[in-house]
Amino acid sequence: EELNRIHDVINIFEDVDTYYSLGEGNTSLIEAGSTLKNYCGSENIFLKNETQNPTWSFKDRGTFSCVCFAKALNESVTATISTGNMGNSTAAYGSRAGLKTAVFLPHYTPEEKISAIGIHGAEIFKIKTDNYSDMKKAILNRAEKLGIRVVSGNGPIRVEGYKSTAFELF
């Protein structure tokens, strides 16, 4: 229902297949506590409770868009580089869409996050690294050579999914 309401402004492709949705969005607003209100000097502060999304993260909004885009391009694989939350979201939505999913994580990623990713059937690659940026560059270069599009936390397709937050506020 939420996707149908905002379809005209999230225009990454003509037809959004809501089958790939896991129920992201339409999260509630929570009134901020007095500490935050006092710190900001305002009595009118509300917070979006994005933990109500399927993988407990705002990233689900963008991942839905990325998965729909991958399906529109007839891709069979989706991949991401993550320290946990993005990997979990990509694994969940990739599974829903029937995509083979690869998640690249630094070796120091907590096991709790790795387990959450694993339950969705993603292929997990733990990379020994001391520098996340270097790891990311190396993976992106390799993925490009293999013809695999890696979804990131700030790509334009992902941002289309984040638009839904603004529309829920108005």
Region spans (language model):
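PLP-dependent amino-acid enzyme catalytic core
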Residues: E1-F170
